[in-house]
Design a protein with these regions (language model features):
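Flexible, active-site-adjacent loop/turn segments at secondary-structure boundaries
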Residues: 47, 73, 81-83, 87, ...
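Conserved Radical SAM active-site core
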Residues: 41, 100-257
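N-terminal pre-triad scaffold of radical SAM enzymes
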Residues: 58-102, 107-133
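N-proximal short alpha-helices
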Residues: 14, 18-21, 29-32, 88, ...
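Bulky hydrophobic/aromatic packing residues
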Residues: 4, 9-13, 26, 49, ...
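Flexible, acidic/Gly-rich N-terminal and inter-domain linker regions that tether
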Residues: 1-82, 86
Length: 258
């Protein structure tokens, strides 16, 4: 699939962008293909992630050219405040430096008033969005996520709410015994704007078992994201790399998202 506007100007060749002397044959072939509008394969992605030396500069130049073709030099940003409403969680992800047990020093669980207060403070400072996430508190009611959204919208109707990872959607839907589609649709009706595609880490089953044995499987994460899209909810998607992963799993992760 070619996501670029065919009416935008194309580079005549890779040589128009970089000095091709010394480029590896495979990387040169991949870059020439994408400049002609062909989508890189998963194997191509592995090769690009493993690139070194002069190949890296060529990859950067082509990537920048493709970005400019699609979006010009327009840059945008959002003034956002992250509000983590609880750090109490018992999932035991090996990389997490955030989670506390409920009886541990530093454990917290914000009230609705505290969450709204922090969002109001952000609004007064120019924020137009809040990102709301937290641990999976064992005493949390299934309606708590919708209660947060309703409280925020009652006080700040124009604030965009970007909230609840697929893991949290799974948790809330499970507690309310609802399908993911129905649960997300209910949150949308309450005022949820978008869902952060966090908790993705690396979408590889073997790696996830080692890092996050109690977390969502890659298949379940994808199922929930697809459920969100099916009811008209937009999401982001993240990647967490640099631990026990590598070029093969990075490329597979991105191709799965694509």
């Amino acid at each position: 699939m070619n996501h670029m506007d065919p009416n935008l100007p194309r580079a005549a060749s890779l040589a128009d962008l970089v000095d091709v002397t010394g480029l590896s044959r495979n990387v040169r072939r991949i870059l020439e293909d994408v400049l002609e509008g062909r989508e890189a394969s998963e194997a191509d992605g592995v090769a690009l992630f493993a690139a070194a030396g002069r190949d890296i500069a060529a990859i950067v130049a082509v990537a920048d050219h493709l970005r400019e073709r699609v979006n010009g030099d327009r840059v945008s940003f959002v003034v956002n405040r992250n509000i983590n409403f609880t750090n109490v969680c018992y999932m035991g992800c090996r990389f997490c430096g955030f989670a506390k047990r409920s009886d541990e020093e530093g454990a917290e669980w914000l009230s609705l008033d505290q969450i709204v207060g922090r969002a109001s403070e952000a609004w007064s400072r120019g924020a137009t969005e809040v990102c709301i996430q937290g641990g999976l508190h064992p005493k949390m009611e299934g309606t708590y996520y919708r209660d947060i959204v309703l409280a925020l919208k009652a006080e700040l109707p124009d604030m965009h709410i970007h909230a609840y990872s697929p893991f949290e959607i799974w948790y809330g839907a499970s507690k309310r015994r609802m399908s993911y589609e129905d649960y997300i649709a209910d949150l949308m009706e309450c005022g949820l704007g978008t869902i952060p595609g966090t908790a993705a880490e690396i979408l590889d089953t073997d790696i996830r078992k080692q890092l996050t044995k109690n977390k969502l499987s890659a298949e379940r994460w994808v199922e929930i994201i697809r459920a969100a899209h099916s009811v008209g909810m937009k999401t982001t998607a993240t990647i967490m790399y640099g631990h026990i992963d590598g070029p093969e799993t990075w490329a597979a992760h991105i191709c799965l998202l694509r």
